[in-house]
């Protein structure tokens, strides 16, 4: 009976040790992936200066109003603000500016025009409720645009690195507990 218990204990310890090592390896791989994808995007972002934006005007540009230019197939919200002592065009995120420089906000659902228009009107109403809000600007003097939020800000970075850190800590604790259990069982066997 005693030999079977020792064998089962060793098998369980081996499995727990393998689980701990697997957790540490997965955390290392996740750190590598995040370090090569999210971290460079965070470091590349120039939108670092936080300021207070004052709403000047908003306008919903429709397909008819954009004649002669590349016409988007969705309603376009254009927001003009005063930030850091100058007039600026507000963009929802950095990607919004890259997708269409004429639009401050691009609706999520572009399949249905009426749903997209309702979404744009809802966002416009929120701007009228809050005339002052925080925005991010680039430190360059001649920059005439600001963003409402960064895609890869400090919160996203913290949340992205939380789970691999949790996995790494759990794996290391599991390995430490197995090693402690082995050393305590050796000490108990010597007595």
From Swiss-Prot:
Q: Which ranges does the record list as Cytoplasmic topological domains?
A: 1-18, 177-191
* Free-text tissue specificity from the UniProt record: Expressed in many tissues containing smooth muscles. In brain and heart, it is not expressed except in the vasculature, such as cerebral arteries, aorta and corona arteries.
Does the keyword Ion transport belong to this entry? yes
**Where is this protein found?**
Membrane
Q: Name one GO cellular component term.
A: voltage-gated potassium channel complex
Provide the record's note on post-translational modification.
N-glycosylated.
Q: One Pfam family, short name please?
A: CaKB
What topology does it adopt in the membrane?
Multi-pass membrane protein
The residues that carry sugar chains are 80, 142
The alphabetized UniProt keywords are:
Glycoprotein, Ion channel, Ion transport, Membrane, Transmembrane, Transmembrane helix, Transport
Q: Name one GO molecular function term.
A: calcium-activated potassium channel activity
Query: Does the record's keyword annotation contain Ribosomal protein?
Result: no
The residues on the Extracellular side of the membrane are: 40-155
Q: Where the protein is mainly located, per its record?
A: membrane
Membrane spanning residue stretches: 19-39, 156-176
- Family, as annotated: Belongs to the KCNMB (TC 8.A.14.1) family. KCNMB1 subfamily.
**Binding partners and assembly:** Interacts with KCNMA1 tetramer. There are probably 4 molecules of KCMNB1 per KCNMA1 tetramer.
| Summary of the function given for this chain in its UniProt record | Regulatory subunit of the calcium activated potassium KCNMA1 (maxiK) channel. Modulates the calcium sensitivity and gating kinetics of KCNMA1, thereby contributing to KCNMA1 channel diversity. Increases the apparent Ca(2+)/voltage sensitivity of the KCNMA1 channel. It also modifies KCNMA1 channel kinetics and alters its pharmacological properties. It slows down the activation and the deactivation kinetics of the channel. Acts as a negative regulator of smooth muscle contraction by enhancing the calcium sensitivity to KCNMA1.
Q: What is this protein called?
A: Calcium-activated potassium channel subunit beta-1
Q: Which organism is it from?
A: Mus musculus
